[in-house]
Amino acid sequence: PWSSGSAYGLMIEAGAKMTQMENRIVLARFKDGFGPVGAYFLHLKTYTQNGLGEEFESKWWPQLQEMVGKEYLDPELSHKTHRPIPTCLRNHAMISEVNAGRGPIHMVTMEAFQDPHLEEVGWENFLGMTISQAVLWAATDVDPKHENPELTTSEPYVMGSHATGSGAWCSGPEDVSPPEYFWGYNRMMTIEGLFGAGDAVGGTPHAFSSGSFTEGRLSAKAACRYIDDGKGEGIVVSDKRINELKEKIYKPMEHYKIYRNEVVAGDVNPNYINPRQGLDRLQKLMDEYCGGATVSYMTNEKLLSIGLKKLKVMEEDLEKLAASDFHELLRAWELMHRHRTAECVTQHTMFRKETRWPGYYYRGDAMKLDDENWHVLTVSRRDPDTGEYTMEKAPVYHLVKDGE
């Protein structure tokens, strides 16, 4: 996970049930600046080509249809009905084309940018949203009017508010939820009195910004109703518990004070690691064992097992995490939350024995989509006392039928 992970780490630690944590997202982006491509595709009507100047996506559809089935990939029907081909499948075509040696992938901007208005829109799009992309093009002499910029696929992201559905297993709204998916208050987690929204809530993809703040409003109203119903009465936190939490939170700073004079060179210390060292270690671990960008998003049960073992060893080392100031203390806790999130992601990826989202990740030992056994939601719970995970399947209910 490349976000701070705190929305997930706090809940996992508390023993909340989580869902769809294997459903990470990989995004097609302009290379190095990571500017989004959607506005260019939709507004400027640009399109992609391989390094030879060829259309490449369609050549991968037959292979992909073998993997996922015609129900999920039917280019002819998509053309007739304007139903878009899923993002992950388009990613797969891009990844496969590069791995076949016909990269890089280019966004064809030279045609659209001949129109002065569209050229202005193209630049303003990034100057208003992803300034780094516009600056990078200027700094590297890339003019989209005269040169088609390169695209790439991103590292995996774990989030519940964009196109994927990672997050907590929450109660749905009373009016549309099946009985077992509603337990009194909309967006309440499986922990009594704990509510979530946006990234924190699982199984609700495509919320984006507007959906997230709308969900936040729904969640806040439900939490107020919970309080009005008297459910929050009698909650007492003792001074002893408060002091225990303070000690836990400030432990990295205390550890630094004790061992700060034992640095042998640079940041090397035999008695602690700092947040940056831990972050680099976690990134490398997840990238290599849980289907990261450098391995073309490929993993398998053996790799995931090794990853879980290394995460366990890292958890022991996080006991010696040090923070020199409040900023590093923030980074230290972000790292611990990322680590817990990474563990949950790895557990879920191992549990789902299929490749449900080719282009987001691949289970090399189970490369096909398997609706017979895995058209389900995955649900986990980490026991706060033992650290052990319990995994289960939950049914998917199609509340909106095809064609509605």
Role assignments for model-derived ranges:
Residues 22-206, 288-404:
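Mobile, glycine/GP-rich and aromatic-enriched active-site lid/loop segments adjacent to catalytic centers
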Residues 1-36, 209-222:
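Glycine-rich loop(s) and the adjacent beta-strand/alpha-helix scaffold that form part
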